Amino acid sequence: MECCRRAAPGTPLLVLAFLLLSSRTARSEEDREGLWDAWGPWSECSRTCGGGASYSLRRCLSSKSCEGRNIRYRTCSNVDCPPEAGDFRAQQCSAHNDVKYHGQLYEWLPVSNDPDNPCSLKCQAKGTSLVVELAPKVLDGTRCYTESLDMCISGLCQIVGCDHQLGSTVKEDNCGVCNGDGSTCRLVRGQYKSQLSASKSDDTVVAIPYGSRHIRLVLKGPDHLYLETKTLQGTKGENSLSSTGIFLVDNSTVDFQKLPDKEILRMTGPLTADFIIKIHDLGPADSTVQFIFYQPIIHRWRETDFFPCSATCGGGYQLTSAECYDLRSNRVVADQYCHYYPENVKPKPKLQECNLDPCPASDGYKQIMPYDLYHPLPRWEATPWTACSSSCGGGIQSRAVSCVEEDIQGHVTSVEEWKCMYTPKMPVVQPCNIFDCPKWLAQEWSPCTVTCGQGLRYRVVLCIDHRGMHTGGCSAKTKPHIKEECIIPTPCYKPREKLPIEAKLPWFKQAQELEEGAAVSEEPSFIPEAWSACTVTCGVGTQVRIIRCQVLLPFSQSVADLPADECEGPKPASQRACYAGPCNGETPEFNPDNGDGLLGGLQDLDELYDWEYEGFTKCSESCGGGVQEAVVSCLNKQTRELADENLCVTSRRPPQLLKSCNLDPCPASHLLSREMNEVVVLADELCHHPKPSTVQACNRFNCPPAWYPAQWQLCSRTCGGGIQKRDVLCKQRMADGSFLELPETFCSASKPTSHQGCKKDDCPSEWLLSEWSECSVSCGEGTQTRSAICQRVLKTGVSTVVNSTLCPPLPFSSSIRPCMLATCARPGRPSTKHSPHIAAARNIYIQTRRQRKLHFVVGGFAYLLPKTTVVLRCPTRRFRKPLITWEKDGQHSISSAHVTVAPFGYLKIHRLKPSDAGIYTCSAGPAREQFVIKLIGGNRKLVARPLSLWSEEEEALQVRKTNPKEALQTHKHQNGIFSNGSKAEKRGLTADPGNRYDDIVSRLLEQGGWPGELLASWEVQDSAERNASSEEDPNAEQALLHLPFTMVAEQKRLDDILRNLSQQPEELRDLYSKHLVAQLAQDIFRSHLENQDLLPKPSEQRFPPMAVPAHKHVSGFSSSLRSSSGEAGGGSRRPHRKPAILRKISAAQQLSASEVVTHLGQTVALASGTLSVLLHCEAVGNPRPTIHWTRNGEAVQFSDRILLQPDDSLQILAPVEADVGFYTCNATNALGYDSVSIAVTLAGKPLVKTSRMTVLNTEKPTVTVDIGGTVRTVRGVNVTINCQVAGVPEAEVTWFRNKSKLGSSHHLHEGSSHHLHEGSLLLTDVSFSDQGLYSCRAANLHGEQTESTQLLILDPPQVPTQLEDIRALLLATGPNLPSVLMSPLGTQLVLDPGNSALLGCPIKGHPTPNITWFQNGQPIATAPGLTHHIWGAGQILRVANLSGGPQGEFSCLAQNEAGTLLQKASLVIQDYWWSVDRLATCSASCGNRGIHQPRLRCLLNTTEVDPEHCTGKPRPAVQPVACNRRDCPSRWMVTSWSACTRSCGGGVQTRRVTCQKLKASGISTPVSNDMCSQLAKRPVDTQACNQQLCVEWAFSSWGQCNGPCIGPRLAVQHRQVFCQTRDGITLPSEQCSALPRPVSTQNCWSEACSVHWRVSLWTLCTATCGNYGFQSRRVECVHVRTNKAVPEHLCSWGPRPANWQRCNVTPCENTECRDTTRYCEKVRQLKLCQLGQFRSRCCGTCGKA
């Protein structure tokens, strides 16, 4: 066919219009897309193998933003990398090996399969647990997960299908085929049960062939699995599976788990060899093995290439076929191999056109190929349909369909079906006559023929066909009856009529006619027409009818009349009698069946016989109510005897008569069914009989495979039209009730749907928010906005924009938010001052009296009464107040009826209720401040917060938001005196930071911390408010006036109390806390009075005296509390207690004071004017403790300038710089000691308390040291390094590790972390990665000081888990020497004498342990006569030239600072030697030849071994000893048997038997046979021999010479060869196998093989020139003599000559218009000249046409 044609006139205009329209459309699309430029070229692939990524870019040509992305990706380099290339992620990690991390080089290994961020480069330092993210993104093309093709692109994990395409979800099927349907493999599953015997300890479980996948075996029982393999090259292997692990067996990965009660074997596959799973018997019990795997179908159909074209030019066709291919051997095999698998469907042939070029201009023609263009293609041809198998109701008819081919002469021949498979095969079966068969249709019943008593009624029954017409063809057997009896309940009072009144016309006539009608069928039958009218109007007359012989023609559904002799069977009557009613009132009896009309005799019978009731039947139920039926009998009225029922008139039979019976209730039974037609269920115990079984087995056979759908999953959407899925599995229900899951191809029925739509209703309207805009400023503080549209998702899944009033109100903060960029630099002012700042107030508020409204500033804590309105302000600087946001317990707060969030930076809570308690957070950009609100109940107790308002997640959130230092301090306080032991308070860092001051406030409220009169007035507060007119104490009223509405204290004051309490001994905390709380209450109240100018004079105070400090300081109150009066006296009566130093908080020190007095725990700063320093130290204890002072760890040297006062205080006069340091007060008695330090600094310079000692720890779980020394400790302990600093102002402490600054809390490595708390550094669970130099730097305005501690981690000597290194060292030291590894339990090595041996001492530890060798407990150097060498840093001991005997025990002792480890091994020198045992048994019991031969044994350590081991050892000389030298008793002597008398068929052989006696001298003499007969039975002297049959080969005569021809006149002839006896009895051929077998075939001369190939002359060439000329000739096999054609197979012994060849292969010179084929006239007749390919071949003829 031509690929293009010339356009018709007018086409250019159409094309131009189309191009213009296309350009407009394209331009509008470009406008919508934002005018993108064309995509650029693809970049280089990110990888050269293993699957990488390449990208392409485009740019936006519009000034507006363009829709869509400017980058696209595709996969590339999807070829496997060579094995030596390594993992791509590992290459990226190793690139960081030469980059120091925290000052140290590591070898980095990849960390794969991170579920949180698989596309970040996380690596682990080799040999440690340190995991670090070295880069936020891996290189493009890196696999997201090790077992997935998904790849990381630009830091995001992109889905990649098995077709290596981005975004593709195509996956491999169970057979490993990408996007396969699972048809190339089959599921194999089964169970094996061991039946091993004593003689057979191994058995084969299953053979799993090459290429199988997803193998899983589970063994349950005592036996053991092992593997045997065989590769395709024939190499065999075995794996014993001795331990759990992952092995590589013949390049297949095997995952084996050995559990106590079972073994599990998994192999993902595909297997690279045949695996034979075997079982080894290890126990008495049987084992079972369940296995499942997918086995590849190794024989599959493979489509062939196209066969040669049917024509060489001018257009032909060609087809493909399919061949069966063996995947293992890579060769084509017979088709039956592929037919074995039902999953294999042979592909249908494909047809395509070929050689479409026109043939050369010549008169040649292509006729050598088997197909030709000028005759039709092979086609399907069908025979006519057969007759329908059924005339109605649906039948089938069939026909034959074959593939035929028509040659150029028009001859049609059948060919192979595959030649026609390019078109669908016509159906061979079709349904026919699918209309319904005729059916009986009954009309309604007529009225009863009588008005009283018993009568008859009739109905019309019609045969109706599928068209609704009355016709024949219905079965007479299924016809409903047309007559039945009827009873009128009205009694008859007139004489009984002899016969019931029959139906009047037309009922009787019509029913009788229809009843006698016959159906027309496909067989000729007599069909009667309707009866004529009766010949008389009364009395008896006659009726006649016409009888026709008819047949039903099925193809036309019409009826044809036939001659009467065509119908078989009796012809129905054509005349009968009729009765038209009585004449003149007579009532004669009439029998319609009596055609003669003779009625005599009936009257007599009627008079003699009649029906009567005779009793009732047995009751149908024994209880509970049943029924009885009356028995109707035919009786002789004269004799009253039973008569035959035929003698009574049937129409007179009385109606059925029933009555009830046995109405008494039944006893209790399981089911009761009686009068009420109900079922009453009773208790099972009330039934006497055994209860029948309610369950029985049925249908105990496997069900056919069927689809089993699971429950529908949840809808993918809650509204707007979603999808829900379910699993639909093909399963087979087994006979035992279990289910077997099968591949889907096993279920023939159509698969139920696994997807369906759901939630097809509209969604509620909701806001759709855009992305946040860019910040409104380029630096500093700005805002971001975003737009919102109200949309609704309809039930169709389409989103539509709706009116914004339909969406809920949108909070202001949802559309605008603050943003902070880098601070804007301004000349002369630090940029940090421009960040937002919240002016917080760090106060504690306690409400004591009811107030309507209270105002607070964020930053503090408030303990308030319910129903109080609270206004909370958030004063900010450098921040716009409308942008302030509020949170409560981490949740964003919005305005409501109860809480108002004002746009001016404050929050208002109306009338507090318990749910309002919590943590309120004000956010101004990055600045955040909190305010905690707690509620006070009516009993002055804090109201517990509702559980639902505080979850563990919120707790964790608040702790993270709180300063970790404060959290640690909170933890410390809660573990102190105020902790009540609850779980929440013992959780340490996770405790609620809002509970920090609850205990102090509770004490203030409950434990009388207020002045006494004040408390009394407080307690009557509520009653005073409830009843203002009640008579109360006027003093209390006055005190109530003095009580503040809300008491205020600074948080710092409460923090000092908590810190002070935490430093007190436990036994003093309760007492101390009472003092501190009481002092706090007095200070708060006094501060309030001072502020109000209401402080009464001392004489007017009704409160206890309070200590007033020298200056006014509301929240920094302090007081020197002395011991209580109880402690002042009565020392002997007090219980014994260890010393405790009272820790007190002094007033703030003034640097200008000339005399400084302070308590312990403070810092003293020496100024130029300081003349004296007095350090107080108060201690309690029983016995009274003694006090001594040290400075910087050394005892204080007292002098005239440094004095010890009588109260144990230390006074320093005229202090100088040498006096600077930490002074420690030590209190000691017999029960223990206590010490507290105080720092004295120079002009406030920082001071660090140091210790220069080295601490070694190998056992304790915790180590605490002061900074300045060295700590050597084992792993896993918690190390605390105290850095106690002093300075005024307070020095800031900074920690460094290896000169790198440490944060407040940080994970050093996996499992270890550090925490900073009040100047101390806590290292938890230290390991080698924690080693280093830790430095503490104290700095303030006056200077800085740095001290360091070196931390060294020790590892005690231990046996390493991996022994490959020392084994390699042993192999390198002595490749051929026997070696043994020492162990703590001891090992043993057995050696030959003179051998050398290597002993390895596997050890690891830090620092490297020192190894010492011993023999028998003595140092190896002092061992006598032992040649030894120590190599490998002491780990290898070589001992040489070991002599015989045990060498004793060798041991190696490894020791370092962390501990020691002793390992042992024993060397045993073995030797073989000969041993002479007792004499062996005498060789004879009598005669002169008996000797005792001494027995030699080869021994090894007293154990007998193979004598070969003693070869070369000197044998002991042994001499035989004579024994049993005496006369023997008489015995029979026999000679050898003679030769058999016959070689087959049974012969005889003989021997000589004599009785002889052997003397002690060795001479044997004959004696009488009787002497031997007394001792033993005489042996036989004759026996049969050669009993086997005599056989020979026999053969028949040669058959005719008619076998296959093998040459000219040469054929093959045969004869039979069989085995038989000499008697002619035929035997199996095996009986004659020992004899040479005669030949059964030979060559012979045959006239039939006198044949040869005969060829005709070549035809004319199809072309005179060119490359397409062919000629053919006839080739046939003919007989030489007759010259007639014979079958070609007779000539097959010779090569068949060619029947076609090319010709006239020369270039054509002229191109004139002429015909090149002789069929051009037919081309013109068929009007094919309009086709180009014919027009060119028949140029001349078509030109004339």
From Swiss-Prot:
As for subcellular location, the record says: Secreted, Extracellular space, Extracellular matrix
Matching entries from InterPro entries are given as: ADAMTS/ADAMTS-like, ADAMTS_ADAMTS-like, ADAMTS_CR_3, ADAMTS_spacer1, ADAMTSL1_dom, Ig-like_dom, Ig-like_dom_sf, Ig-like_fold
Q: Give the matching SUPFAM superfamilies.
A: Immunoglobulin (SSF48726), TSP-1 type 1 repeat (SSF82895)
Q: Which UniProt keywords apply?
A: Disulfide bond, Extracellular matrix, Glycoprotein, Immunoglobulin domain, Repeat, Secreted, Signal
Cysteine disulfide links: 45-76, 49-81, 60-66, 534-578, 538-583, 549-567, 775-819, 779-824, 790-807, 874-922, 1177-1225, 1283-1336, 1401-1452
Q: Name the GO cellular-component terms.
A: collagen-containing extracellular matrix; extracellular region
- The residue range of the signal peptide is 1-28
Where in the numbering of this chain does the PLAC domain appear?
1709-1745
Output the Pfam families linked to this UniProt entry.
ADAMTS_CR_3, ADAMTS_spacer1, ADAMTSL1, I-set, Ig_3, PLAC, TSP1_ADAMTS, TSP_1
Region (Disordered) residue spans:
966-991, 1114-1137
**At which residues is glycosylation annotated?**
251, 310, 391, 451
Q: Which domain of life is it from?
A: Eukaryota
Compositional bias ranges of the Low complexity kind: 1115-1126
Instruction: Give GO terms for biological process.
Output: extracellular matrix organization
Chain ranges of the TSP type-1 domain: 33-82, 376-424, 436-493, 522-584, 607-667, 703-762, 763-825, 1528-1591, 1649-1709
Segments forming domain Ig-like C2-type? 836-938, 1139-1241, 1261-1352, 1378-1468
Q: CDD domains in the record, alphabetically?
A: Ig
User: How does the record describe the protein's post-translational processing?
Assistant: Glycosylated. O-fucosylated by POFUT2 on a serine or a threonine residue found within the consensus sequence C1-X(2)-(S/T)-C2-G of the TSP type-1 repeat domains where C1 and C2 are the first and second cysteine residue of the repeat, respectively. Fucosylated repeats can then be further glycosylated by the addition of a beta-1,3-glucose residue by the glucosyltransferase, B3GALTL. Fucosylation mediates the efficient secretion of ADAMTS family members. Disulfide bonds are present.
Assembly and interactions?
Answer: Monomer.
- The protein here is known as ADAMTS-like protein 1
Name the lineage. Answer: Eukaryota, Metazoa, Chordata, Craniata, Vertebrata
